[in-house]
Design a protein with these regions (language model features):
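Extracytoplasmic soluble-region selector
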Residues: 36, 63-153
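N-terminal secretory signal peptides that target proteins for export/translocation
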Residues: 1-12
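Conserved SGNH/GDSL esterase-like catalytic core that processes O-acyl groups on lipids
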Residues: 172-267
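Sec-dependent N-terminal signal peptides of Gram-positive bacterial secreted proteins and lipoproteins
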Residues: 10-35
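N-terminal secretory targeting modules
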Residues: 14, 31-73, 141-185, 189-195, ...
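A short helix->loop->beta-strand "cap" motif at the edges of active sites that frequently abuts
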Residues: 280-284
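Catalytic His-Asp segment of secreted/periplasmic serine-dependent ester chemistry enzymes
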Residues: 293-383
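Second-shell loop/turn segments in exported
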Residues: 222-225, 254-263, 273, 305-311, ...
Length: 383
């Protein structure tokens, strides 16, 4: 029994010694681990701010960017449009701001509604249509005279003989230099405008190359020349010698009125353009639409047959002239748009006689030229 007790005693002591040794070793190992993995105090302080800086520099993918606001004015074709009948439509927007960015509103859609610049007459009356973009806005007075043609013909003659559209307002008294390098070519219609313009200088130093009775056929076939600096000259020579950069044309009314000259209308344009561009290859050419004629009968529906025929032909040839201008790299300015009454004739307030415009008509013409000049300066194009 003594040997057994001694053996047990020895085993107990050995076990206790092993436990103590393990505890000491474990304690030493634990200190060593903390020393190797924990960074020095200075290193830890340096790492944390770097992490914060990176977080601040990261872009916020959810933040919304401000839309770019475009420069330029809103340009409408007219300051006033009066439809003849319910159901008529018209696009009054020119630019320069893209159409899809412009907001449109009608004060009374039951009279005239508007969508993306297109007006629709929906009822009889008068209202206002507004276009806006960013901090810019512009308005147009719009209306409609009648629901049926029968009701339209019952209206006062002065209403039916008034212009369907008025040009945008322009301060003609403000000095203008846009036309200082421009010329305008025409017949007696243009010559009368020259007489009024020379009293006001509303078109600056524009050069007038006008001669009464002339025509496309007369100039192209050398039957009549242009006066330049007091002497007769071929048109292409006058343009070259003047050094102008831009030439407006209002020619063709005498051609439209003559059956034989009508047949040569665009052939004569071909001849004139070829000659002009041969001597002045960089000159800009703008074709102005021909104008309707006036009839002073008491009722518009009783327009004289020859005037009705001419005005119908004018519409046809103006449409072809617009297409011709586009195909031949020329600008096109629709002056007739502003001169017509509700029956497609020259408005009563603009006529001097059946063919020529008075001072009011010429002032409207000058407003149109000035307005479209501003439009071009801001990036618009004539077409």
């Amino acid at each position: 029994m003594r040997k057994t007790e001694k053996k047990v005693e020895f085993v107990k002591k050995k076990a206790i010694m092993l436990l103590l040794a393990a505890a000491v070793i474990g304690s030493l190992c634990g200190c060593g681990a903390r020393s190797e993995t924990a960074p020095p105090a200075e290193t830890a302080a340096t790492v944390e701010p770097a992490t914060e800086t990176t977080a601040e520099a990261a872009p916020d993918e959810t933040a919304e960017t401000e839309p770019t606001v475009m420069e330029g004015d809103l340009f409408l074709k007219a300051s006033s449009v009066t439809f003849s009948l319910v159901g008529e439509q018209e696009d009054i927007y020119l630019g320069v701001i893209p159409r899809e960015l412009v907001s449109w509103e009608s004060d009374d859609p039951s009279v005239v509604s508007v969508e993306n610049g297109v007006l629709t007459a929906t009822g009889v009356g008068t209202t206002t249509v507004r276009a806006s973009y960013a901090d810019r806005s512009v308005s147009c007075t719009v209306g409609c005279l009648a629901e049926t043609e029968e009701a339209l013909l019952q209206l006062d003659t002065d209403i039916l003989c008034a212009p369907k559209r008025l040009p945008p307002e322009v301060d003609l008294e403000e000095p203008c230099t846009y036309f200082d390098n421009s010329a305008i070519v025409g017949d007696s219609i243009t010559f009368i405008m020259f007489q009024w313009e020379s009293k006001s200088n509303y078109l600056g130093d524009m050069l007038f190359l006008a001669r009464g009775g002339t025509s496309l056929n007369g100039i192209a076939r050398r039957f009549s020349n242009i006066y330049y600096k007091g002497t007769e000259a071929n048109l292409e020579d006058a343009i070259q010698q003047s050094g102008v950069e831009r030439v407006y044309f209002l020619l063709g009314s005498n051609d439209i009125g003559d059956p034989s000259q009508r047949l040569l209308y665009f052939e004569n344009w071909d001849i004139m353009l070829e000659r002009i561009r041969e001597k002045s290859p960089d000159v800009e050419v703008i074709m102005i639409s021909n104008l309707p004629q006036y009839d002073d009968l008491d009722r518009p529906e009783r327009t004289q047959p020859h005037i009705r025929t001419y005005n119908d032909l004018m519409v046809e040839y103006n449409a072809q002239l617009r297409q011709y201008a586009e195909e031949h790299g020329c600008g096109y300015l629709d002056l007739s748009y502003y001169i017509q009454d509700h029956f497609g004739r020259m408005a009563k307030i603009y006529h001097q006689d059946n063919y020529h415009m008075n001072e009011a008509g010429c002032l409207s013409w000058m407003k149109v030229l000035r307005y479209y000049a501003k439009y071009e300066l801001e990036g618009g194009t004539l077409s």
